[in-house]
Amino acid sequence: LAGRPRSAEAARAQGGVRLAEADGRDEVIPLPVHPSIHDALAADEFDLIILAVKAYHTETAAREIREAGGEGVALLSMQNGVGNEEALGVILPASPILAGVITTPVEVRGPVHVKVSRPSFHVGLANAREKLPGNKGKLAGVAALLRDSGFAVTTYDDYRSMKWSKLLMNILANAQSAILGYTPAQIFADPRLGNLELRAWREALAVMRGQGVKPVAVGGYPLPLAAKGVQGLPLGLMRPIFARFIVGGRGEKMPSLYYDLHPQPRAHSEIDWLHGAVAREGARLGIPTPVNATFTRIMRALLRGEESVDAWAGQPERLLAAVVQHGVDGDMP
């Protein structure tokens, strides 16, 4: 395991990685943690590198792998958002690349201290480089390895369908939670805000269609059915269904983008790989994405300190007005 120096130091101090299970068990798993990718690759030989860094660190991690002589080792990209596999392919052209998604909600309690919020161990895998010799065999081998470790594994033919489907899950009640400081339950308790979430989904689905990408049932979630409902039924009918899904799935856990602004803005955010990716691809394809584009614009302004986080927190009317200004009907039907 390679992490930041403070993570390696914490692991040495406590004797490994601390894992708190959903059933109350809390144990330390003895595992060497290296302070850098270079140190990890120098210490041993590896058949597989699993990348679990935030999307904004993907290119840096890839360059470190290349500089440490790790090009050619198979990579499994488990990051949220879209675009990571493509970035890896540019920097590491000789490496087999697999795409992966996981739907297990976890809470980071501290350096190398993780709590499993809900014991749902589903992993999706797909080749991100079909034409590279040996990639198909790598996929089968990694799938078998994870199944032997207790994961329910599903393999997909199109990694883009898998990753964009996971994006649908990740964007739900995410940016609004960060901007307004609301829980997902609070967002869906307001019909106007709940409808905004479904509008963002409609935009993402339109962008997926424009790329020839279909939603798949990642982690067993009925995303294809949900997509049909969002596209074909009134939002007022779909909103309560999504409210139950998001509140039941997350529990008390706040979504990822919330922590990019609270308790204070961070230097980086995955907004550009989530809502920003929808807006960017929409612009490329000529597909309007006013809700996702507005979420992205506001998040960027808050992260850069151009606007105050406090000025947007608890201000749904201001957010709704910003979206309307970008071209969405004011009644949000």
Question: Model features per residue range: what roles?
Answer:
Residues L1, L51-A52, M78, D157-D158, ...:
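Active-site-adjacent beta-strand anchor residues
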Residues A2-F46, A277, E281:
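Conserved N-terminal Rossmann-fold NAD(P) cofactor-binding segment
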Residues R6, V82, V101-V106, R129, ...:
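Glycine-rich beta-alpha junction loops
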